[in-house]
Amino acid sequence: MENGAVYSPTTEAAPGTGRGARSGLAAYFVLGRLPWHRRILKGLQLLLSLLAFICEEVVSECGLCGGLYFFEFVSCSAFLLSLLLLIVYCTPVHDRVDTGKVKSSDFYITLGTGCVFLLASIIFVSTHSGTSAEIAAIVFGFLASSMFLLDFVVMLCEKLRESPLRKPENNAKVEALTEPLNA
């Protein structure tokens, strides 16, 4: 037997690799797991929370800094959480995790982030000094919190639409399963 025949199956290029329309890093990103309206909402959450964080970082002086610091923490956390959720939805990580757990995590993270971001924006409104950077951060904060809460409402509507489909079909099957086998 010749060496070429022994080693040829292991040295051939794997099918589907090489230069194509989706090679390299682009092959790892799949945007189709979310409907188009949810993709837009997730992108707006990411963008607006980043803009709120950047505008807040530009603020150089503050009178009552507690609201500013809380807003800073919340806007940065919202940005990182929305980035994490987008990474999970758009990469092969989504295939390795249970889809129900991803949806449930997204549901509760979006609700919590939206509520806390709204609270941080309200607190920042009551403690800001009136500079243009603070006002821009507040506007982006309210817009970002509204995108988070709108995404939560969309997920809630989808969840309520799915729930009647999952009701038990027949209780007679359950009764038949509990009967003894030797009867």
UniProtKB/Swiss-Prot annotation:
Residue numbers carrying Phosphoserine: S8
Protein name as it appears in the record: CKLF-like MARVEL transmembrane domain-containing protein 6
Similarity comment: Belongs to the chemokine-like factor family.
InterPro entries: Marvel, MARVEL-CKLF_proteins
Cellular component annotations (GO), alphabetically ordered: early endosome membrane; plasma membrane; recycling endosome membrane
Function according to Swiss-Prot or TrEMBL: Master regulator of recycling and plasma membrane expression of PD-L1/CD274, an immune inhibitory ligand critical for immune tolerance to self and antitumor immunity. Associates with both constitutive and IFNG-induced PD-L1/CD274 at recycling endosomes, where it protects PD-L1/CD274 from being targeted for lysosomal degradation, likely by preventing its ubiquitination. May stabilize PD-L1/CD274 expression on antigen presenting cells and potentiates inhibitory signaling by PDCD1/CD279, its receptor on T-cells, ultimately triggering T-cell anergy.
Pfam families (alphabetical): MARVEL
Major localization listed first in the record, in broad terms: membrane
Transmembrane segments: 46-66, 68-88, 107-127, 135-155
Membrane topology of this protein: Multi-pass membrane protein
Record topology, Extracellular segments: 67, 128-134
Keywords: Acetylation, Cell membrane, Endosome, Membrane, Phosphoprotein, Transmembrane, Transmembrane helix, Transport
Swiss-Prot/TrEMBL GO biological process terms: endocytic recycling; protein transport; regulation of protein stability
Modified residues (N-acetylmethionine): M1
Lineage of the species this protein comes from: Eukaryota, Metazoa, Chordata, Craniata, Vertebrata
Cell compartments where the protein resides: Cell membrane; Early endosome membrane; Recycling endosome membrane
Top-level lineage group: Eukaryota
